[in-house]
Amino acid sequence: MSRTLASIGWVACWCTLAVLAACSTTTTITESRDTRAVSEPADPERRARVRLELAGLYFGRGQNSTALDEIKTALAAKPDMPEAHGLRGLVYASMGDARLAEESFLRALQLAPNEGNTMHSYGWFLCQERRYPEAEVQFEKALAQQQYRDGVRTLLAQGVCQARAGRWTESERTLSRSYELDPANPVTAFNLSEVLLRRGELERARFYVRRINSVPDQVTSQSLWLAARIDRRLGNFDALQDHGRQLRDRFPQSPELLLFERGRFDE
């Protein structure tokens, strides 16, 4: 599954953005601004929230060390803040420190055992670590929380994780549920199309990827490559060549174009 399910990167990004959205803020970071100069609220909880919001912004920009500094400040003000521990888990996971990431997620769940967002994040971390049965448990727990409102996101991540584990039937079922709830999401459509291709459901796979490629802003080298692989299997050679032309015109430096030109359609 080297370049198939390449959309997993899309999922990781989308999951991260969704988590950061929970840390919504009106604080703006500029290059010249020193966040230490931000006036600190007197209330410890409010002070922790401000620092956590800044941490989320820095994490979203890839400034992991600065994000960790802000999380440390937030936890100094409010040590039992589950969101701070959860975000710290995401930061450590993105840095490749699995031990500290897991410690942070577990601490967050200890403080807030019914927090679906943390279960989702921990589940995705476990999937990245190829601990698929444990990841499945966390996704199911998140979906079972009555107050959890991000089920579509979790179904998407769960479906991708099931595909990574080679559980194609379950993955199709899970991704189909996610698609039914959010049919406009191109990430879900892409992954569902990929899984259907794997299962030999070529016409159905073609349906979903065509929905993506019919919207100019959603077209990527990955979606064109997926369409090319499907149409080649179907024997639609005119469509196959059209996908190749689009790859050359729109994504001339993409790895997918190189694979196309070398005829490596089964990778």
Language-model features, listed with the residues they occupy:
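Alpha-helical segment of the N-proximal tetratricopeptide repeat
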Residues: D43-A77, S94
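Helix-start (N-cap) detector for alpha-helical repeat units in TPR-like alpha-solenoids
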Residues: P41, A48, P82-E83, G116-N117, ...
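Register position in tetratricopeptide repeats
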Residues: G60, S94-M95, Q128-E129, Q145, ...
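Canonical tetratricopeptide repeat
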Residues: E53, L87, S121, A157, ...
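Structural marker of alpha-solenoid helical repeat scaffolds
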Residues: D43, A77, L111-A112, Q145-Q147, ...
